[in-house]
Regions:
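Surface loop/turn signatures of beta-propeller and other carbohydrate-active proteins
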Residues: 1-6, 24-27, 41-76, 104-132, ...
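Carboxylate/His-rich catalytic cores and anion/metal-binding grooves
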Residues: 79-109
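Beta-strand-rich domains and repeat architectures in extracellular enzymes and scaffolds
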Residues: 1-18
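Conserved small/polar residues in nucleotide/adenosyl-binding loops
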Residues: 282-289
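Active-site neighborhood of glycoside hydrolase catalytic domains
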Residues: 131-181, 185-206, 223
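Beta-propeller blade signature
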Residues: 34-37, 97-101, 154-156, 214-223
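Entry beta-strands of beta-propeller and related beta-repeat scaffolds
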Residues: 13-16, 73-83, 136-140, 193-198, ...
């Protein structure tokens, strides 16, 4: 068990999906486990949601409520839940889709998978949100090329066909691979007319305390490009290889937590903007705890 995936609040329930091996404790047969809660403290575990098969393992991703039924998998009266996840197999990673019409318990993999394939080995962890452009809006996917320390932005009208928008990075902390990005708009002191965009990036290793860590960047997003309010330095190419940044260098960047064990944190879809709620996992402790 590791990364929290597909966090979504729907019909009064918090749904937490998570990386899970239903056949053992080793890093294999990766699927999505599933639990629900009404209060974020007490959880009920359900049957695994999206299972691995002979063609793919189910890596991290996200879930959205498709209120406008833009995907066509549900109806306007009963919108589907749509999951975008990384399908991983044989050194290749691409983004795939599954959908649920029963509130998030039974999932069907889309026959047209993958929905976004760059032909690379480290393209993963899609986080999807709805962007309001003043018109009908559209979907934005934030994902990473992990080893390149780049965040890639794509857009879609129907969650099935994706178009490249822009990239961010490498910049700031690069002492480990970039994974599990998230991005959301956050009002300053509750004023929706004065808001910033926050980009979250998990690093492993390369955190400020020497282990894993979650870095944040505050900036602007115009629907195409993310621009930090205070631009971060572009690292020298050798840093992407030797992964050496000092504590003093790392203190210049934003961190969610200053311990060595905060990783893969993402926020719930379906909550009001002022209720932005993340869930992370304790990466080091997970590896030190016996199954």
């Amino acid at each position: 068990m590791n990364d929290p995936n597909g966090l979504v609040f729907h019909d009064g329930l918090y749904h937490l999906y998570f990386q899970y091996n239903p056949q053992g404790s080793e890093h294999a047969h990766l699927s999505w486990g599933h639990a629900t809660s009404t209060d974020l403290a007490r959880w009920t575990e359900h049957e695994p949601a999206i299972l691995w098969d002979d063609t793919e393992q189910i890596y991290s991703g996200s879930v959205v409520v498709d209120h406008g039924n833009t995907s066509g998998f549900g109806t306007a009266e009963k919108p589907p839940l749509v999951a975008l996840y990384t399908a991983a197999a044989d050194g290749h990673q691409a983004q795939a889709l599954a959908y649920s019409t029963d509130g998030g318990y039974v999932w069907t993999k889309y026959r047209g998978n993958p929905v976004l394939d760059r032909g690379t080995s480290d393209f993963r962890d899609p986080k999807v949100f709805r962007y309001d452009d003043g018109g009908d809006g559209y979907w934005v996917m934030v994902a990473v090329e992990a080893e390149d320390r780049q965040v890639l932005f794509h857009r879609s009208d129907d969650l099935k066909t994706w178009t490249y928008l822009s990239s961010y990075g490498p910049a700031g902390p690069v002492g480990g691979v970039w994974e599990c990005p998230d991005m959301f708009r956050l009002a300053i002191d509750g004023d929706e007319d004065d808001a910033r965009w926050v980009l979250l990036i998990s690093l492993n290793p390369g955190g400020i305390a020497g282990g894993s860590g979650t870095h944040y960047v505050v900036g602007e997003f115009d629907g195409t490009t993310f621009r930090p309010t205070a631009p971060l330095p572009t690292p020298a190419p050798e840093l992407l290889v030797d992964r050496g940044q000092s504590r003093d260098e790392l203190e210049a960047f934003g961190w969610i937590d200053f311990g060595p064990d905060c990783y893969a944190g993402v926020t719930f879809d379906g909550l009001a903007a002022h209720e932005r709620t993340p869930v992370s996992y304790t990466h080091l402790r997970a590896h030190e705890t016996k199954a």
